[in-house]
């Protein structure tokens, strides 16, 4: 049985992922809340890796709000989400995690991005 850590496991996507994984092959799911670990801080992330000992990490956690709050504090949202990813990826490397999956948000793409979006497409309209 593999030990999995799902960051953001108690959010919308995380709850659905937990339900899917629970119906599949046996895995041990760990989904601690953000109050336990500040994923923007290297010390907290290291402490989490040591305590949870995950073999697989699914990174779904993000600082989110709504369109209004995102527009009021774009740098804060960008910074905190970036730091979570950086700290978790480095922690995974340092703790020899077998598999790391990070999920992004549509908020990271330009305002007028065609759907479906292709990484080869570029836009000068970045919000």
Pin down the residues of each PLM region.
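SDR active-site strand-loop-helix element
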Residues: 7, 32, 57-63, 100-106
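Adenosine-cofactor binding site in Rossmann-like domains, unifying the SAM/SAH pocket
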Residues: 22-48
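Short acidic/polar active-site loop segments enriched in Thr and Asp
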Residues: 27, 55, 98
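NAD(P)H-binding glycine-rich loop region in Rossmannoid oxidoreductase-like domains
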Residues: 43-82, 94
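Active-site loop signature of alpha/beta-hydrolase-fold enzymes
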Residues: 12, 37, 42, 63-69, ...
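Catalytic helix-loop patch of NAD(P)-dependent Rossmann-fold dehydrogenases
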Residues: 72-90, 94, 98-99, 107-127
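N-terminal Rossmann NAD(P)H-binding glycine-rich loop of SDR-like oxidoreductase domains
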Residues: 1-22
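Short, well-ordered alpha-helices that flank and scaffold nucleotide-derived cofactor binding pockets
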Residues: 15, 19-23, 50, 62, ...
């Amino acid at each position: 049985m593999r030990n999995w850590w799902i960051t953001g496991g108690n959010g919308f996507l995380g709850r659905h992922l937990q339900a899917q994984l629970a119906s599949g092959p046996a895995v041990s799911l760990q989904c601690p809340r953000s109050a336990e670990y500040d994923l923007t801080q290297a010390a907290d992330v290291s402490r989490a890796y040591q305590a949870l000992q995950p073999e697989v990490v699914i990174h779904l956690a993000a600082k989110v709000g709504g369109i209004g709050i995102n527009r009021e504090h774009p740098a804060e949202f960008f910074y905190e989400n970036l730091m979570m990813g950086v700290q978790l990826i480095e922690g995974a490397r340092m703790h020899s995690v077998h598999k790391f999956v990070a999920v992004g948000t549509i908020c990271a793409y330009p305002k007028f991005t065609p759907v479906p979006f292709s990484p080869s497409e570029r836009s000068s309209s970045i919000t």
